[in-house]
Amino acid sequence: MITEDGAQLLKASEAGGSEGPVWDGKDSLYFTGRGRIFRLDAGGTTHVFREASGGANGLLFDRERRLVVCEAANRRVTRTEADGTITVMAESFEGKKFNSPNDLTMDSKGRIYFSDPRYGKRDSMEMNVEGVYRIDAPGVVTRVLGRDLVDRPNGLLVSPGDRYLYVADNNNNNTGAARKLWRFALRADGTVDGQSRKLIYDWGDGRGPDGMEMDAKGRLMVAGGLNKAQPPHETDKSKGGVYVLSPKGKLLEFIPVPLDEVTNVAFGGADLRTLYVSAGGTIWSIRVKTPGLAH
């Protein structure tokens, strides 16, 4: 068992946390939902960090502990500076607006990778690619994965040593579309070796993978699945929860979460042994034996 003996899944916050949990490296968990960014402090109180968040989804703290935000509604990625000002990191590619930046990860050099899918209405899309991009500096953006290798990218994770980029490919709006977790080799320059694509896990015709994290033993914690089918596109064959996978894709364990939709995970607490899960407008927590990787 990866969880502590007797550990139970607990409700940490019911403020409306639907996505983006991230530990700030000190004493708080940040997360998104209801158009806001929230902060859950060490005492268990939830605060509104930002009221108008631009439809914030995925969150990340960079090496200088600045909050980087996927603003899905504003179709951009921003960074909050120490003085509270906002720096736009990415808002277009080749003159076209992004679809709706969703989730992000960072490599050891501080380069940020983000996914740009479009769920729901598609009439405002300016590009026909739902890709993965790398930000080297504000406004310096490169597409690293396109439609030839991913269908609808969502959660991302760079492995230790920048060896791999894991991509949750989750097109849950179409029957028979991708609900897969891929692994790609990362080159030193931050580009992706497309020929290295390896299938790690397939959710079949259920709800596919979303956000993910890795623990200190290299095991993947992947949010995914669905407790109640959503016909015609999604069955409930893969239940909602956290899928604990080996680096090669073996299902080692499953942590069920009772509410849909299970969207993301984060390690937190002073020892990084509290696993937080966003699902059903709630932030859940459970204690685990092995800490998560520090960011």
Model-derived segments and spans:
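Sequence-structural signature of mature extracellular/luminal beta-sheet repeat domains
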Residues: 1-295
